[in-house]
Amino acid sequence: MHRPIPTRPTRPTRPARLASRAAAAAALLVLLPAVPAAAAETPHLDAVERELRTVSPGLEGRIWERTAGNTLDASTPGGADWLLQTPGCWGDSACAKRPGTERLLSKITENVSRAQQTVDVSTLAPFPNGAFQDALVAGLKTSAARGNKLTVRILVGAAPIYHLGVVPSKYRDELVAKLGDDARNVDLTIASMTTSKTAFSWNHSKILLVDGQSVITGGINSWKDDYLETGHPVADVDLALKGPAAASAGRYLDELWSWTCQNKSNISSVWFASSHNAACTPSMPKAPVAAVPRGDVPVIAVGGLGVGILRNDPASAFRPHLPAAPDTKCVVGLHDNTNADRDYDTVNPEESALRTLISTATRHIEISQQDVNATCPPLPRYDIRVYDALAPKLAAGVKVRIVVSDPANRGAVGSGGYSQITSLAEISDTLRNRLTLLTGDRGTARNTMCSHLQLATFRSSSAPTWADGHPYAQHHKVVAVDDEAFYLGSKNLYPAWLQDFGYVVESPAASRQLTAQLLGPQWQYSRPTASVDYEQGICPAA
């Protein structure tokens, strides 16, 4: 049978072929889902995440969590006022105008006023007072007046004896009175808690969370006497954020509230009060995932449980090398959770996160803290592994800048006690000693330190003190590396066994804003106090 030979089609011209291919490609793009741009490299977050999966794998999604799609919550897209500073009066020792404080208070009211279901407040005792309380109440009234039925949890950490006057039922009554008729739409659950008296452990986190979608967190305590109604306000900083990492803060608070509710009948640990006979609320309703527009900032939320909530992470196979140092212990023989307790490590992943973040630096590290060393006794003098993270960085030529609160603030815990050292030499001597162990030679250690370290006490103006004569007090908890990533939260670098929370953020754009708005002006005014400064050739005697 004869098979017919098909006729060969006419070959289209080159322009026609290109047009046809372009049309086909365009049609295909319409049919396919949008593909996001390749994610930016995140070496710092990746290293922290790996460490947390080793140390505390069973606490992922509860105490720590990595998320993408977050937005730093500025008043304008790309703005820098997601960084909430108090008082924000750089260059003015009289601090007549306090734009940072004003922005913080207005942001508190703004966020709370948008609440539709839930508001979480967490801080160190005493309860928010003065304009802090007014900002919270104003937001609650605005939301409630719109007909929203709100569940509000307020949790403070209470130091034994020191905070005996912090009474939840009294604060509930204050809020109900200030809310007036709007109180009928607000269910208040209020508690103070202490998880371990012998280990000095209580809530120290500072979180304002609204509907699990927006969060303000950092180091700022809501205390009028220290931050507002004074001529020498504490320098401090929070960040504002929207996105999945806000919900991470809610899951962390649920852990603290679960313990609080379980122990609310034990008056030696928990004092509890509520309005409308509301029960203790161990967990809040979860916000819908699609409720917040997605951003582009990757974040690790990371907290710690201190002592008394959970002994260890049963899922962890972590086996750390725990270095020793003879000068970490003082007179009191208190168990050293920071330097000598593997189980403590597994339920306080934030400490591993901070050490790891420091270790990821390749160019420079900025540390802005109240202190790097603790009050000894009763606590260990310092975290050996923090210094042992810094020492090899200095030896490798990484520049390190440390700014701490003026030691003239040394005093009792709480108001007025914003330093725990007597001299910057406590820090530089410790760092030199750890470098000596690393290099094997004291002279080499000194030269290494003085070639790469800057160490100073905080000032916010060119004057040596505030206009009223008081020393500058700094309460930051910031660690920044390479203008690429930073930690901002409530966790100090010195030993303290509290419940704390913060974020590790990897964003070069946000890191540049942090430098421009805080770290740059800080060094401009603090530099004259430097006891070590490789740029000025200042070096302590051998």
Regions found by a protein language model. Give the residues of each.
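Charged, low-complexity intrinsically disordered terminal segments
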Residues: 40-542
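N-terminal secretory signal peptides that target proteins for export/translocation
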Residues: 1-18
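Bacterial N-terminal signal peptides
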Residues: 23-34
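Sec/Tat signal peptide C-region and signal peptidase I cleavage site
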Residues: 35-39
